[in-house]
Amino acid sequence: MDVMNAFDSQAEDSPLSIGHSLRRRPLARKKLSEMVEEELEQMIRRHEFGEGEQLPSERELMAFFNVGRPSVREALAALKRKGLVQINNGERARVSRPSADTIISELSGMAKDFLSHPGGIAHFEQLRLFFESSLVRYAAEHATDEQIALLTKALEINSQSLDDNALFIRSDVEFHRVLAEIPGNPIFMAIHVALLDWLIAARPGVADRELHEHNNLSYQQHIAIVDAIRQRDPDKADRALQTHLNSVSATWHAFGKKNQKMR
């Protein structure tokens, strides 16, 4: 393929108007870095460079595409964000396989912007409720004895962390992470981790003393969820999970309103 022919081609002039609605307007030209990125991505997807294989050096890519170093570096940085290459200091870029974490991290910026909009937190809380509702139903029907033992261990850590808010938050996240691991789907794990990260980051600041009662209630609700899973009762597990997440949502909304009144 003559890569440079594609880079140098110019669009033909279009007519002043097409039909009644389309009128001539200038087409945005792609940056050189974007064209380099697209071509390298196609090469990777065609397996011209295999997973784990190093790409040519920056100097070789500059010569091949007839572009400057900034264009090559921007293209490689974009491929890294997509999870298609790994870049370590002093080494050539190496082809990698995109992971579920990579896919979710690409959405992270947009998600955080969305959370700042009116109703954004409520929409993400609803997404979490729908998602974890399916997880606990699956767990009640399919969790192995070993997985239930891991949930029990997570409960024990919950119990030991009740008087330390920072530890309890970590143990709370760990409890829900164990739930998300039960189906064995890495995409579920990536979604779950991202959802909790986004929601926790959006929570208001709260004094430690105000969190103690909330921590104990969450712990008791975790017990109810695990009991229902042990009983292999998906409906009961679902109800316990919904009670828990609705309670968590109401508590943090109340904390947020209280903070606003104090300003």
UniProtKB/Swiss-Prot annotation:
CDD domains with a match to the protein in the record: WHTH_GntR
Single Gene Ontology BP annotation: negative regulation of DNA-templated transcription
Transcription among keywords: yes
Superkingdom in the source lineage: Bacteria
SMART domains tied to this protein: FCD, HTH_GNTR
Molecular function as annotated in GO: DNA binding; DNA-binding transcription factor activity
InterPro entries linked: GntR_C, TF_FadR/GntR_C, Tscrpt_reg_HTH_GntR, Tscrpt_reg_NanR, WH-like_DNA-bd_sf, WH_DNA-bd_sf
Keywords: DNA-binding, Repressor, Transcription, Transcription regulation
Function: Transcriptional repressor that controls expression of the genes required for the catabolism of sialic acids.
Family: Belongs to the NanR family.
Official protein name in the record: HTH-type transcriptional repressor NanR
